[in-house]
Amino acid sequence: MFVKFRGANDRMYKLGIMGYEWMRTSMEGMRRSNDYMSGNIFWMYNDCWPAVGCSMVDYYGVPKAAYYGFKMTAQKICACVYDDGKGLRIAVSNNSAGDSAAEIALHLVASDRIL
C-alpha cells in the first residue's frame, strides 16, 4: 500500500483501504478504552458535495470503505489484536446485554503464505 500510485483507480482504492484501517483501528481503540470513554461523535459522516474525503458515506449516500470498518467494529461483540509495546494482545469487547460464548482462531499471515 505504501508504494507509488499506479493511476487514479489505484489511488482511490488505496485511499479507501487507508480510510477503512483508520476507522477500524480508531474504533478498536475506543472499544478497548470502554471504561474511560463511552461515546464518539463523527465530524464527517457524509460529504456535502461529490469529492474524495474522509467521510464515511459519499454525497450520493453510498458507503465508503471507512463505513464498513465502522460497521465491523460497532458489532455488539468485537475482538481485536493490538501491540501494547510488550507484545501482541487480544481484546474482546462485549456490549451486549449478557454473557456470550466465543471462540477465536488466530492466524499469522505473511504476504505470500500463512505461517
PLM segments and residue spans:
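Carbohydrate-binding surfaces of carbohydrate-active enzymes
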Residues: M1-L115
